Protein backbone atom coordinates (compact mmCIF):
# COMPACT_ATOMS: atom_id res chain seq x y z
CA UNK A 1 0.00 0.00 0.00
CA UNK A 2 1.44 3.44 -0.90
CA UNK A 3 2.52 5.55 2.06
CA UNK A 4 0.14 8.34 1.08
CA UNK A 5 -2.77 5.94 1.62
CA UNK A 6 -1.50 5.45 5.17
CA UNK A 7 -1.55 9.19 5.85
CA UNK A 8 2.09 10.01 5.09
CA UNK A 9 2.06 13.45 3.50
CA UNK A 10 5.74 14.44 3.64
CA UNK A 11 8.95 12.69 2.60
CA UNK A 12 12.34 13.79 3.93
CA UNK A 13 14.98 13.33 1.25
CA UNK A 14 18.74 13.84 1.32
CA UNK A 15 19.45 11.90 4.50
CA UNK A 16 22.73 10.32 5.63
CA UNK A 17 24.85 13.04 4.04
CA UNK A 18 23.87 11.94 0.53
CA UNK A 19 21.89 14.30 -1.63
CA UNK A 20 21.86 15.43 -5.23
CA UNK A 21 22.06 19.22 -5.05
CA UNK A 22 23.82 21.51 -5.21
CA UNK A 23 26.24 20.14 -7.80
CA UNK A 24 27.66 22.79 -10.11
CA UNK A 25 29.59 20.26 -12.17
CA UNK A 26 27.41 17.72 -13.95
CA UNK A 27 30.17 15.09 -13.84
CA UNK A 28 30.23 15.35 -10.04
CA UNK A 29 26.45 14.90 -9.94
CA UNK A 30 26.65 11.82 -12.15
CA UNK A 31 29.45 10.41 -9.99
CA UNK A 32 27.36 10.89 -6.82
CA UNK A 33 24.38 9.19 -8.46
CA UNK A 34 26.60 6.31 -9.57
CA UNK A 35 28.07 5.91 -6.06
CA UNK A 36 24.57 5.80 -4.57
CA UNK A 37 22.95 3.70 -7.30
CA UNK A 38 23.08 0.62 -5.08
CA UNK A 39 20.94 2.47 -2.53
CA UNK A 40 18.80 4.74 -4.68
CA UNK A 41 18.83 3.04 -8.08
CA UNK A 42 19.78 4.80 -11.29
CA UNK A 43 16.59 6.13 -12.86
CA UNK A 44 16.56 6.96 -16.54
CA UNK A 45 16.22 10.73 -16.21
CA UNK A 46 18.12 13.72 -17.53
CA UNK A 47 20.56 14.86 -14.85
CA UNK A 48 20.56 18.51 -15.84
CA UNK A 49 20.10 20.35 -12.54
CA UNK A 50 22.72 22.09 -10.44
CA UNK A 51 21.01 24.15 -7.75
CA UNK A 52 18.62 23.17 -4.99
CA UNK A 53 15.94 25.21 -6.75
CA UNK A 54 16.46 23.22 -9.96
CA UNK A 55 16.35 19.93 -8.05
CA UNK A 56 13.19 20.77 -6.09
CA UNK A 57 11.50 21.83 -9.33
CA UNK A 58 11.77 18.19 -10.44
CA UNK A 59 9.25 17.27 -7.74
CA UNK A 60 6.90 20.24 -8.05
CA UNK A 61 3.42 19.02 -8.99
CA UNK A 62 4.85 15.60 -9.91
CA UNK A 63 4.66 13.71 -6.62
CA UNK A 64 1.70 13.05 -4.33
CA UNK A 65 3.48 14.10 -1.13
CA UNK A 66 5.30 17.15 0.16
CA UNK A 67 9.08 17.08 -0.10
CA UNK A 68 11.36 18.26 2.70
CA UNK A 69 14.89 18.36 1.29
CA UNK A 70 17.99 18.32 3.46
CA UNK A 71 21.37 19.00 1.89
CA UNK A 72 23.90 16.28 2.55
CA UNK A 73 27.41 17.11 3.63
CA UNK A 74 28.73 15.26 0.56
CA UNK A 75 27.66 17.76 -2.16
CA UNK A 76 28.84 20.62 0.06
CA UNK A 77 32.22 18.96 0.42
CA UNK A 78 32.49 18.25 -3.32
CA UNK A 79 31.51 21.85 -4.09
CA UNK A 80 34.24 23.16 -1.82
CA UNK A 81 37.09 20.72 -2.40
CA UNK A 82 36.18 18.18 -5.05
CA UNK A 83 36.52 14.51 -4.17
CA UNK A 84 39.66 15.05 -2.08
CA UNK A 85 40.17 12.73 0.88
CA UNK A 86 42.02 15.50 2.74
CA UNK A 87 40.73 17.24 5.84
CA UNK A 88 38.93 20.46 4.87
CA UNK A 89 40.88 23.61 5.65
CA UNK A 90 39.23 26.77 7.01
CA UNK A 91 38.67 28.25 3.52
CA UNK A 92 37.02 25.03 2.33
CA UNK A 93 34.83 24.92 5.45
CA UNK A 94 33.77 28.53 4.81
CA UNK A 95 32.90 27.59 1.22
CA UNK A 96 30.79 24.69 2.48
CA UNK A 97 28.98 27.01 4.89
CA UNK A 98 28.27 29.43 2.05
CA UNK A 99 26.92 26.65 -0.16
CA UNK A 100 24.67 25.47 2.67
CA UNK A 101 23.42 29.01 3.30
CA UNK A 102 22.60 29.38 -0.40
CA UNK A 103 20.89 25.97 -0.50
CA UNK A 104 18.68 26.86 2.45
CA UNK A 105 17.75 30.16 0.83
CA UNK A 106 16.68 28.11 -2.20
CA UNK A 107 14.37 25.90 -0.16
CA UNK A 108 16.44 23.27 1.62
CA UNK A 109 14.95 22.38 5.00
CA UNK A 110 18.28 21.69 6.68
CA UNK A 111 21.46 19.65 6.45
CA UNK A 112 22.22 15.98 6.93
CA UNK A 113 25.53 14.35 7.71
CA UNK A 114 26.86 10.91 7.10
CA UNK A 115 30.32 9.49 7.49
CA UNK A 116 29.76 6.08 5.89
CA UNK A 117 29.63 6.95 2.18
CA UNK A 118 32.13 8.80 -0.02
CA UNK A 119 33.00 11.61 -0.03
CA UNK A 120 31.42 12.22 3.39
CA UNK A 121 33.51 9.43 4.87
CA UNK A 122 36.61 11.55 4.19
CA UNK A 123 35.34 14.31 6.49
CA UNK A 124 36.90 15.01 9.84
CA UNK A 125 34.54 15.03 12.81
CA UNK A 126 35.98 18.23 14.32
Model-derived features with residue positions:
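Divalent metal-binding pocket/active-site signature
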Residues: 102-126
